[in-house]
Amino acid sequence: MDFSQRSFHRSLSSSSQSPGLSMSSSIYRRGVAPSVYGGAGGHGTRISTSRHLANYGSVPAGGNLFAGNEKMTMQNLNDRLASYLERVRSLEQSNSHLEQQIKHWYETNTPSTGRDHSAYMGQIKELRDQIKDAQLQNARCVLQIDNAKLAMEDFRLKYEAERGICQTVVADLHGLKRVFDELTLTKADLEIQIEELTKDLHLLQKEHEEEVRSLRAHLGNNVNVEVDAPPSLNLGAIMNEMRQKYDAMAQENLQKAKEQFEIQINDLQQQVTVSTEELKGTKDQIKEQRHTYQVLELELQSLLNMKEALEHTLEETNARYGSHLAKIQARLNSLEGQLVQVRTDTERQIHEYNILLDIKIRLEQEIATYRRLLEGEDVKEYQLSTLDEKDIKKTRKIKTVVQEVVDGKVVSSEVKEVEESV
């Protein structure tokens, strides 16, 4: 028997009606010996009859049933009994053969519920551990990426702060340069003023000498007239005193200007030195932070590449197990479809078996009746019965199973039965 899966299954069965029994007392009777034949499984089972004409004559009321042709009747009944017994044995053998085939099919095709999957548990556990390790590694990578981002943000803030400080120092340097330029200009102005004052002093000395010479020349040509007057002023002494006074003031102003200039120059040099050192330290720190930033950027890039590789591996693992799961699901759907087919075939065979069992029961009843007749039970109450041939009605039953399969899975199943006469 073939239990392969099909979308449409047709099972044909034919039922037959055995000839009915009629009781009559006509002179000519037809002796009927029915026999049953059919294939394995009960397909195409029908009952055929063999007939012969016998002239029994008239049977008187209350006469013997086997009067006239008793030997032929007994032989006919024995033949029919042997035929029935042989048919019963044949049906029993066919039934046992069908049961063995069904049992064999269930043993070979039905998936075992107690199947040992322990061989796969180790591999499944190992794969689950790998998936968990990959997930943990992915989480670690994400955490490291977040930490790197936070560190990068901190370094960026520090870099911005140091750059602001550097810009402030540069601005201070520019301011100090401007102050230095102003002091240089002030120094030049003071030097110019000193030169001008020196020139004025020389000019005043020349004028004083000229005035003294002119006065001496004028006094030498005049008569010395003595008058009673207060003593005249000593212009030379006054000029010398004024010259000394102005020289002292010029020297004092020059000394003060030099001291102030030196003080400002020293302060400016100290500020420039400090600013230069700070600028150098800031440049070194900026260089170090730039190097750290490049290192962190490389680490971030490597972590991103590792993350992409892990995500790709995870996707491949999910796809591989998804395809494996889809294959298992398709196999499960196929087995479910085969199970539905087996159940349908089993129900059909049970139906056919019930038909054969009914035929067997009727045959056993007829055998029991014939046995009673042979044993002589109530012989006087029976008259010779004849089996008139009746029209055998054949029917064909078409069973159609329609299954809708989507992605290897049985979505719906519909069974249609159509019975038509042949």
Swiss-Prot record:
Residues of the IF rod domain: 70-381
Kindly state the subunit structure of this protein.
Answer: Heterotetramer of two type I and two type II keratins. Associates with KRT8.
UniProt function note: Plays a significant role in maintaining keratin filament organization in intestinal epithelia. When phosphorylated, plays a role in the secretion of mucin in the small intestine.
Annotated region Linker 12: the residues are 216-238
Regarding how it is modified after translation, the entry says: Hyperphosphorylation at Ser-13 occurs during the early stages of apoptosis but becomes less prominent during the later stages. Phosphorylation at Ser-13 also increases in response to stress brought on by cell injury.
Q: What is this protein called?
A: Keratin, type I cytoskeletal 20
Name a single GO biological process. apoptotic process
* Stretches the record annotates as Coil 1B: 124-215
Q: Does the keyword Phosphoprotein apply?
A: yes
GO CC, alphabetical: cytoskeleton; intermediate filament
Other known facts: There are two types of cytoskeletal and microfibrillar keratin: I (acidic; 40-55 kDa) and II (neutral to basic; 56-70 kDa).
Q: Transmembrane ranges?
A: none
User: Gene3D superfamilies of this UniProt entry?
Assistant: 1.20.5.170, Single helix bin (1.20.5.500), Vasodilator-stimulated phosphoprotein (1.20.5.1160)
Q: What's an example of a GO molecular-function annotation for this chain?
A: structural molecule activity
Q: Where is this region: Coil 1A?
A: 70-105
Q: Which residues carry this modification: Phosphoserine?
A: S13, S16, S26
Which InterPro entries does the entry mention? IF_conserved (IPR018039), IF_rod_dom (IPR039008), Keratin_I (IPR002957)
Its taxonomic placement starts with: Eukaryota, Metazoa, Chordata, Craniata, Vertebrata
